[in-house]
Regions:
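Gly/Pro-rich interdomain helix-loop hinge
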Residues: 103-106, 110-188
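C-terminal and late-domain segments of enzyme folds
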Residues: 16-80, 84
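Structural motif
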Residues: 2-3, 24, 82, 111-113
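Flexible, glycine/charged-enriched surface loops at secondary-structure junctions
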Residues: 37-45, 60-73, 88-93, 131, ...
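A glycine/threonine-rich phosphate-anchoring loop and its flanking beta-alpha core
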Residues: 1-38, 126, 141-148
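Glycine-rich phosphate/pyrophosphate-binding beta-alpha loops
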Residues: 79-112
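Acidic-glycine-rich active-site phosphate/pyrophosphate-binding loop
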Residues: 2-3, 23-24, 54, 87-93
Length: 188
């Protein structure tokens, strides 16, 4: 099996599709990085995908078919995020987004975008009761993992909680740049 990543195939994608698929790739990378199944291999893919998406998604959104570089970088970043989650798996945001999107007729990426802030906060809570049966999950690590993402993106913060909030703020700013509304109600 193989996949061909061809920028020409999505050069004319409308802004809404660019925004929804781009923020979906953000969620893919974040959930793969925070997964208890994450590895050194998936971590590298997820972090690099996030760096590229934060840099190039606003350009791909604004410039559309005139910015070949931004479209190419986004195609590669989405593929990297996909490779990360294909091996580390996804989390509760994607699970809920499937239900939310189906019920409210929302694009999948938009459904993810509407929940990602609260899911990040929920996942980062140091609640040992949430621990699963995975041997690699002997204590809560998700807050630290999100802090590592914030560090990789150069978002600053003194504590891990500060870094988490800076990451959420950066995601919210990205969503605003690409025209994603803030609430389910905003989508009717």
């Amino acid at each position: 099996n193989m996949a061909i990543v061809d920028t020409d195939m999505h050069m004319t994608a409308p802004k809404g599709l660019t925004a929804a698929s781009g923020i979906d790739a953000v969620t893919h990378a974040l959930e793969a990085y925070a997964s208890v199944m994450a590895t050194d291999y998936t971590d590298g893919l997820a972090i690099q995908a996030l760096k590229v998406i934060f840099k190039y998604l606003p350009r791909a959104y604004e410039n559309g078919q005139t910015d070949v570089e931004a479209r190419e970088k986004m195609a590669n970043a989405a593929t990297m995020a996909g490779m990360a989650f294909a091996n580390a798996f996804l989390g509760v945001c994607h699970s809920m987004a499937h239900k939310l999107g189906a019920f409210h007729h929302l694009p999948h990426g938009i459904a993810n975008a509407l929940m990602i802030d609260e899911v990040l906060r929920f996942n980062a809570a140091e609640a040992p009761a949430k621990m699963g049966t995975f041997s690699q999950y002997d204590h809560p690590k998700t807050l630290r993992r999100y802090a590592e993402v914030a560090e990789a993106l150069g978002l600053g913060g003194k504590t891990d909680k500060d870094k988490l909030e800076n990451l959420i703020k950066a995601i919210d700013e990205l969503k605003e740049k690409i025209g994603i509304k803030k609430t389910i109600k905003d989508y009717g």
